[in-house]
Structures are given as C-alpha cells and as structure tokens.
Curated annotation (Swiss-Prot):
One of its GO terms (biological process) is photosynthesis. Its EC number is 1.97.1.12. The gene is psaB. InterPro entries: PSI_PsaA/B, PSI_PsaA/B_CS, PSI_PsaA/B_sf, PSI_PsaB. This is Photosystem I P700 chlorophyll a apoprotein A2. The chain crosses the membrane at residues 46-69, 135-158, 175-199, 273-291, 333-356, 372-398, 420-442, 518-536, 576-597, 644-666, 708-728. [4Fe-4S] cluster binds at C560, C569. Its main location: membrane. PSI electron transfer chain: 5 chlorophyll a, 1 chlorophyll a', 2 phylloquinones and 3 4Fe-4S clusters. PSI core antenna: 90 chlorophyll a, 22 carotenoids, 3 phospholipids and 1 galactolipid. P700 is a chlorophyll a/chlorophyll a' dimer, A0 is one or more chlorophyll a, A1 is one or both phylloquinones and FX is a shared 4Fe-4S iron-sulfur center. Chlorophyll a B3 binds at M663, Y671. It is a multi-pass membrane protein. Phylloquinone binds at W672. GO terms for cellular component: photosystem I; plasma membrane-derived thylakoid membrane.
C-alpha cells in the first residue's frame, strides 16, 4: 500500500480527516518538526534547497531573456529607447474579439503583445547587450547554470557528498568565503564586465565573444596598474554631450569619480559605477580575511564577543555584555535567518530609493511607468522580508533560546526590559497617530467648509536643512555643500560639479518638500512604528507574558488555550506576525501612494496639484485615487476596449480576491464546520453525488489556517489591485 502523504510525519499520515492534507502542506518546509530529523540532516537538507533556489532564479532569468529575444523588440528599442515601447512578450490567445486584438497590437508589433515595465530592457542595454543573439546566448547560459545548480543540490544529498555538521558550524570560514569570494570576487568580476564590455559598448565599440581578447579596454593597457600610476584610468572621461552607444563625445577613462548623471541617459556614469564595484570588491576581499580559521590568523568572533564588555560602573551597565551570543547565533538557524531577512529587507528598501533617485540604467528615468513599478515592487518586497525577520526572531525565542547560556547578556536584557521597549513603541505610535490624523482631519474640515487658509501647514525645516547640507540651493540655507565657497564644498571638489548639477537639476535626487510631504512622512512613520510595535511585542512576548507565562510550551502558532484561561486567544507569536502584515501593507500603501502621486505631479509638470491637495484627506481620495482611477476603469466598457483593459480587469479581480479574504477573517471555524457537515449530508442523499466518497473525513480548517488563508487573500488582492492601478494610471498618462 502506498504511503499516505505526508511521508515526513507518521502521526499526520494516519489522521483520518482532511486535516492530514492541510497540516501536511503547512509543515512541509518545517524540517525541524519532521520524523527522525537530526541536526546534521536538517543542515544538509537546507543546504541542498539553496541550490534548488538558485536553479529557480536562473530559470526565471533565462525565461525573461528568452521571451524578450523571441517575442520582444529589443533591437528596435536599442535604436530609439526614448520612443519605442519595450515588449515583454506576445499574447497568444486574445479571445476577446477584434477590438481587443487591435488594442493590444501595439509598440510596432504585428500581433497582440504586453508592454514591459520590468526595466530589463534598460538593464540589458546598459550592461552591453545590443542584439537578440546576445539575449539568446544569455538565456542558454542561464539554463546551463540552472541545470548545474540542480545537479549540485542533488549531489549534496548523496551520502558521499553530504557536508558534516562541523562544516556547517564553522562560521568564520563561511563568513570569509561569503565576504571574499561571493561578494568580493563577484564585485571585481562585475567591474571586469563593465570595463571590458559595457563601457566600450556605451562608446560604440562592440565587444563580444568574437573579439573580447583583442579589444583593449583602455589604450594604456595594464602598464599604469603595475606602475601604480592608477590616475591614468580616470583621465579623459566621456564628455557632457556624449551620445550613449556611439563614439560621439566619448572618452577613454574606465574608472572615474565624476558624480551626477549622464545628461542624455539621466543615469549614473558607467565609469563611476565600475569604480564603485572595484572599490567595494577590494573592501570585501580584505574583509574576507578578517576571521580566524585553520590558518590561525585574524579575529575569533567568539573572543571578540566574549570580551565585548563595558568597563565596570558604566551607566546603563550591559551586564554580561555579549557573552554566549556566538554559540546562541551559531546554533540557531532561526536567529541567522532573522538577521539575514532584516538585513535584506533594509537593503531592498534602499534599492527602491536608489533606483529612482540615482538610477544606474540608461534611459530608465524617462520610463515613468517602469520607475513607478520598480519602486513599488521593491518596497513591497522589503515589508515582506522585514515581517519574516521578526517571525523567525520569535521562533528563535520559542525553539532555540537557552536562558542559561545567555544569562544576563544583552539578549537576556532585551527580554528583561521588554515592558519598557513595548510601552515606548506604543507611546510613539499613539503620539504619531493622534497628531498626524488630527492635522489631516483639521485640514480636511476647514477645506470642506471653504476656508482652506485655516489649514495647519508645517514646513519640514529640519529635512530641508538636511537637503541644503547635501547641496540643495532652493531653500536658501547656505549651509555645508550648498555654501559654495565653504570648507565642505571644497573638500568634496572631486565630484562636486556633477553632484551639484544633479541635486539642483531636473532629477529625482532630494525632491523639494513642503507641508504635504511633512504630513505624509509622519503618516508613514506612524505605520512603521505600529508595525514595529506589533512585531517586536510578538517576538519579546513569544516565550511568555504575565498573562500566559508558559506560552513557549504551546509553540509558535496556537489559537487559544481553551476557555479555562479566558483571554489566551490571539497572543501567539504567529498572531503578532499575522496582525503586523496588515499594518505593513497599510504602511507600504501610504508610502507608495506618496511616491507615486508626487512623481505624477512632477512628470506632468503640475507640482502644485500634489502640494495643494496632499495636506487634507479628501485631496488624497479625490485628486490621487479617484482622479487616477478614471482612465483605468474605462479600459473596457459597452463601447469597446483599449490597451488598459487588462489592467481594468486585474483591478476588479484584485478587489475580488481582497474582499474574499474577509470571508475567512471574519467568520470562525464553527461556521465552516457546520457548513461542511451540511454539504456532506446533501451529497450523501443526492443521486450521482452519493457515488462519490471521501477517503478523508472533511473537516474545517483550523483557526490559524483559516487566518492564513484570509491573510493570503487580503495581501494578494491588495497587491494585485494597487499594481493594476499604478501601471494603468501611469502608462495611461505617459504611454
């Protein structure tokens, strides 16, 4: 007899109800909980999944390259990136009539296609690709890489090739390898690609597999490198009137510090980018020699942490300091994952900021829809990663934290001071919430009663001061970099011309701000602090609280501990994650609304609309949401359809998915159990239907599972709705 799913849990496999299926899916990746799991086996399985992950990423990249080469218009776009719309892929089956077929036959295509808003065209062009053949080659290369990664994943599950537990626990060697080899070498290798391929292509000099060994990236060759005369590589940069992709105005420099943007492409100078990657690569290679391994040189992280104690009598004494942290972190995969997710979350948010403020890809700043899509995409990913970081932090406290091993160290002190931490976050959230909402509501009321001059408008003077210190002249502060003859400006003379031109020019670096920005900044701060409050409380209370001191014994996710201890519902660490996701989505909504509306106003040359309407609530509802929905909603109507029709449909569908979430969030398990029992009864008493039997007795989802289904619908619907709105409202205006 075939083994029932799930094979990793005999207890679940023998469950006679449909709980077997849903719990099996829910715990499939919780390797720690599987039957017969050892610590070594756990690490080995996780190690192999990393190769699977890499294979999926490689396959995805390969698919993008392949479809753009096959069905896109890359070569036409390269010839005129400002006027040709990039094609993502063909639409094979537009079965909605001739009107729609005509509407989606766009961007010079002869059949229906989708427009690309991914920025991939800009990236491929910037890094030196100009032909479909090169895209195909890249696609095949990534396919081979994926196959290799899959093989590596399989290989490391074979008995002979499974790394030992000691190998996984060797933190210093792993850090050195990741820093020097993965980060360091790959950064230097990327510099090599930019210098040898991308920069020559940007100057009209083709470099490919046919000639890369014979084309010198710099006329002086390697001579200056070996003689230490490195300044030669920065001489003769591209001129301010260089035409990207041609010899016109091109220089010979390969590593520069120009600052600012290429006037035609409005992207960072490629030679500046190459310099950046070389510098950061060298730093990482040095960092990768920092930790002591079997060579006996460098630092021992454990020694550093053990001795990291403040002198006795220091105010705010840290107790045992960082004692015990090395083993605590090194023995907890959840702690490590929490740190990794938090770091990646911050980096992803920074990527969102930098991709629009300091774009590195040629002409991407002129593709408004792509800029908006990429900003929004990266901020949404950032909130997901940050919520995950705290979730795994909480799991660490429940499964991995050892109070004895961490006696009186900084981790134990966090737990001891949790009341102070949580109550301060609560106070900040309340303060921000009441004051910000109070200002918005006041302004809304006075505008509604026809006296807009009675609004309370606060200039963000401190933020304006920071912008002025960075060189923005519009406010007249005359401080630091905006003080032309000052010491700060002189000290940074190397890149000052380019930077000052950028910050005071028509770019996205430090946009002018006013009272509307001040208010929405504090609304976003409210969202961030409230999300943080929920997440931090969930992690710090994960082991127990005054209400439920034995909470850790119930695990990460539990619905309640029955009616006998009234009030134990909704307090598991999982519930904190669940509640935080709603606030995180709320926050990223305000953040992306702000970014998008401010940019729509700038791009359309009507900054007054944002400045005047963003100071009261109805301004946001009417002049941002309602006004920008109109084109979208008319994507299809009784009179026909246009090329926004697909986004109109997605907008409606997103609302449907989102609203479905409430069905699971509002009704509890008993309702569904009764409904299921009634449906089973009806099946059993109906002809034909009664021929069908259930191998598993149908039962309702658990409370926690129903919540996760509700949360998934809410989140996915939220994302689909806003994505459709964002893309349609931007592309409908700017094409």
């Amino acid at each position: 007899m075939a083994t029932k799913f799930p094979s990793f849990s005999q207890g679940l496999a023998q469950d006679p109800t449909t709980r077997r299926i849903w719990y099996g899916i829910a715990t499939a990746h919780d390797f720690e909980s599987h039957d017969g799991m050892t610590e070594e086996r756990l690490y080995q399985k996780l190690f192999s999944t990393h190769f699977g992950h890499l294979a999926i990423i490689g396959l995805w990249v390969s698919g993008n390259l392949f479809h753009i080469a096959w069905q896109g218009n890359f070569e036409q776009w390269v010839a005129d990136p400002l006027h040709v719309r990039p094609i993502a892929h063909a639409i094979w089956d537009p079965h909605f009539g001739q009107g729609a077929i005509d509407a989606f036959t766009q961007a010079g295509a002869s059949s229906p296609v989708n427009i690309a808003y991914s920025g991939l065209y800009h990236w491929f062009y910037t890094i030196g690709m100009t032909t479909n053949a090169e895209l195909y080659q890249g696609s095949i290369f990534m396919m081979i890489l994926s196959a290799w990664a899959l093989f590596a994943g399989w290989l490391h599950l074979q008995p002979k090739f499974r790394p030992s537990l000691a190998w996984f626990k060797n933190a210093e060697s792993r850090l050195n390898h990741h820093l020097a080899v993965l980060f360091g070498f790959s950064s230097i290798a990327w510099t090599g690609h930019l210098v040898h391929v991308a920069i020559p292509e940007s100057r009209g000099q083709h470099v490919g597999w046919d000639n890369f060994l014979s084309v010198m990236p710099h006329p002086a060759g390697l001579g200056p490198f070996f003689t230490g005369n490195w300044g030669v590589y920065a001489q003769n940069p591209d001129s301010m009137n260089q035409v990207f992709g041609s010899t016109e105005g091109s220089g010979t420099a390969i590593l520069t510090f120009l600052g600012g943007f290429h006037p035609q492409t409005e992207a960072l100078w490629l030679t500046d980018i190459a310099h950046h990657h070389l510098a950061i690569g060298c730093l990482f290679v040095i960092a990768g020699h920092m930790y002591r391994t079997n060579f006996g040189i460098g630092h021992s992280i454990k020694e550093i942490l053990e001795t990291h104690n403040p002198p006795k009598g220091t105010p705010g004494d840290l107790g045992a300091g960082h004692k015990g942290l090395y083993d605590t972190i090194n023995n907890s995969l959840h702690f490590q994952l929490g740190l990794a997710l938090a770091s990646l979350g911050v980096v992803t948010s920074l990527v969102a900021q930098h991709m629009y403020a300091m774009p590195s890809y040629a002409f991407i700043a002129k593709d408004y829809t792509t800029s908006a899509a990429l900003y929004t995409h990266h901020q949404y990913i950032a909130i997901a990663l940050m919520c995950g970081a705290f979730a795994h932090g909480a799991i660490f406290f429940i499964r991995d934290y050892d109070p004895e091993a961490n006696k009186d160290n900084v981790l134990a002190r966090m737990l001891e001071h949790k009341e102070a931490i949580i109550s301060h976050l609560s106070w900040v959230s309340l303060f921000l919430g009441f004051h910000t909402l109070g200002l918005y509501v006041h302004n809304d009321v006075v505008v509604a009663f026809g006296t807009p001059e009675k609004q309370i408008l606060v200039e963000p003077v401190f933020a304006q001061f920071v912008q002025a210190a960075s060189g923005k002249a519009i406010y007249g502060f005359d401080v630091l970099l905006s003080n032309a003859g000052g010491a700060a400006a002189n000290a940074n003379a190397a890149y000052m011309d380019g930077w000052m031109g950028a910050i005071n020019g028509n770019t996205d670096v430090f946009l002018p701000i006013g009272p509307g920005d001040f208010l929405v900044h504090h609304a976003i701060a409210l969202g961030l602090h409230t999300t943080t409050l929920i997440l931090v409380k969930g992690a710090l209370d994960a082991r127990g609280s005054k209400l439920m001191p034995d909470k850790k014994d119930f695990g990460y996710s539990f619905p309640c501990d029955g009616p006998g201890r009234g009030g134990t519902c909704d307090i598991s660490a999982w519930d904190a994650f669940y509640l935080a996701v709603f606030w995180a989505l709320n926050t990223v909504g305000w953040l992306t609304f702000y970014w998008h509306w401010k940019h729509l106003a700038i791009w359309s040359g009507n900054v007054a609309q944002f400045n005047e309407s963003s100071t009261y609530l109805m301004g946001w509802f009417r002049d941002y949401l309602w006004l920008n929905s109109s084109q979208l909603i008319n994507g299809y109507n009784p009179f026909g359809s246009n090329n926004l029709a697909v986004w109109s449909w997605m907008f409606l569908f997103g609302h449907l998915v989102w609203a479905t979430g409430f069905m699971f969030l509002i009704s509890w398990r008993g309702y569904w159990q009764e409904l299921i029992e009634t449906i089973v009864w009806a099946h059993q008493r109906s002809p034909i239907a009664n021929m069908m039997g259930w191998r598993d007795k149908p039962v309702a989802l658990s409370i926690v599972q129903a919540r996760v289904v509700g949360l998934a619908h809410f989140s996915v619907g939220y994302v689909l709705t806003y994505a459709a709105f964002l893309i349609a409202s931007t592309s409908g205006k700017f094409g």
